[in-house]
């Protein structure tokens, strides 16, 4: 899995440049020639669209305007990658809903698997044109990590505009030292991350480490390298790392539990009391309506939500899971016994608000 940011494809702040992408394309070609399967997650649609209509919008423009630029630029982005390879390049556009909904998530996995079986090169991007959440900081870094787990990748390579992770921001601190090997992403390591310094893309080093943590939970190592350096990319194509290796977690979680933990969450939460929190964390129980005190947001049945403990100290997130009932229904059955659900609602989807098989503790 290779993730490429827009700052590497439009490094002069203008449109996409084959010159900037050439080294990365050679890295891809070397891996394909070695018989490896590869998937690319590539940003750059907004930057390409901005070059088509340079006076249309600034970097900090409203989401709707940037989405329009993405619509203009996505074809340019795919054309850029297609020109480097003799094999077919497949465009795959995903949204948070595709990753949050279990059925669509599995459909995406099946499609990507078939593309790889056919010998195609999938190039993935968020569907910027319709996805409101897409244009948040670092989204494609996290997308790359989730897709890496989706296709059961061996490794995640994240091309950035510096030489990897440093002990401090090397642009502002001359004493910053490079870290070539990170056995574990501790809070101290995360604190070392600074911004990328680029005004072309939206991802900083912090989001790249968050992506590495997500990939690591699926047993996937992450490599951060300087995608602008021809020497670094050529070395990488020969399996010689010049950058930062971030080890995978020691314990790999099951595929379904991974999805529950890392899929984008619906803007909503189920609020529970201390007794329910103890049953979830200590006994591995399902969440029953009797321990529910309320619901936040307007989520629907089948949506991924957070499960939060509400007590005198406030709220804190305990778990994530797939709700069997909508927020409206949960407010009506909160504090009720499971046997009362049908009497209150006029129907029942079962005794559990969230079944333990559809729940993961955080």
Swiss-Prot record:
Taxonomic classification: Bacteria, Pseudomonadati, Pseudomonadota, Gammaproteobacteria, Lysobacterales
Pathways per UniProt: Amino-acid biosynthesis; L-proline biosynthesis; L-glutamate 5-semialdehyde from L-glutamate: step 1/2
EC class: transferase
GO MF entry, a single one: glutamate 5-kinase activity
Organism whose genome encodes this protein: Xanthomonas oryzae pv. oryzae (strain MAFF 311018)
CDD domains registered for this protein in UniProt: AAK_G5K_ProB, PUA_G5K
Its biological purpose: Catalyzes the transfer of a phosphate group to glutamate to form L-glutamate 5-phosphate.
Methyltransferase in keyword set: no
Annotated EC: 2.7.2.11
Keyword Transferase appears in the UniProt entry: yes
Family, similarity comment: Belongs to the glutamate 5-kinase family.
Catalytic activity of the protein: L-glutamate + ATP = L-glutamyl 5-phosphate + ADP
Residues annotated as domain PUA: 267-348
Name of the featured protein: Glutamate 5-kinase
Residue sites binding ATP per the record: 3, 160-161, 202-208
Amino acids binding substrate: 43, 128, 140
Record GO biological process: L-proline biosynthetic process
Recorded GO CC terms: cytosol
Subcellular location, principal: cytoplasm
Keywords: Amino-acid biosynthesis, ATP-binding, Cytoplasm, Kinase, Nucleotide-binding, Proline biosynthesis, Transferase
Compartments in which it is found: Cytoplasm
């Amino acid at each position: 899995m290779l993730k490429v940011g827009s700052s590497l494809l439009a490094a002069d702040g203008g449109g996409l440049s084959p010159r900037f992408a050439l080294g990365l394309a050679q890295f891809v070609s070397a891996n394909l020639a070695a018989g490896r399967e590869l998937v690319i997650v590539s940003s750059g649609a907004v930057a390409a669209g901005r070059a088509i209509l340079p006076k249309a919008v600034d970097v900090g423009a409203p989401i709707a305007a940037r989405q329009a630029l993405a619509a203009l630029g996505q074809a340019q982005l795919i054309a850029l990658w297609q020109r480097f390879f003799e094999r077919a390049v497949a465009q795959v556009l995903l949204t948070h809903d595709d990753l949050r909904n279990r059925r669509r998530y599995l459909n995406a996995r099946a499609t990507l698997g078939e593309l790889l079986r056919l010998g195609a090169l999938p190039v993935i991007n968020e569907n910027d044109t319709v996805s409101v959440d897409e244009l948040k900081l670092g989204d494609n870094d996290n997308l790359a990590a989730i897709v890496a787990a989706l296709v059961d990748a061996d490794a995640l390579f994240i091309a950035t505009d510096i030489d990897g992770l440093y002990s401090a921001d090397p642009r502002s601190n001359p004493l910053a030292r490079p870290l070539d090997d990170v056995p574990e992403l501790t809070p101290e390591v995360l604190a070392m991350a600074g911004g990328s310094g680029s005004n072309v893309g939206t991802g900083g080093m912090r989001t790249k480490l968050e992506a590495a943590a997500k990939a690591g939970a699926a047993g996937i190592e992450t490599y951060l390298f300087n995608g602008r350096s021809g020497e670094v990319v050529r070395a990488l194509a020969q399996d010689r790392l010049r950058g930062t290796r971030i080890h995978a977690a020691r314990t790999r979680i099951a595929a379904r539990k991974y999805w529950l933990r890392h899929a984008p969450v619906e803007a909503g939460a189920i609020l529970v009391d201390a007794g329910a929190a103890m049953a979830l964390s200590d006994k591995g129980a399902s969440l029953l309506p009797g321990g529910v005190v309320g619901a936040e947001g307007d989520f629907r049945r089948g949506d991924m939500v957070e499960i939060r403990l509400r007590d005198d100290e406030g709220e804190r997130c305990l778990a994530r899971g797939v709700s069997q009932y909508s927020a409206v229904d949960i407010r009506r059955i909160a504090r009720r016994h499971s046997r009362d659900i049908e009497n209150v609602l006029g129907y029942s989807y079962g005794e559990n608000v969230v079944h333990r098989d559809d729940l993961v503790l955080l």
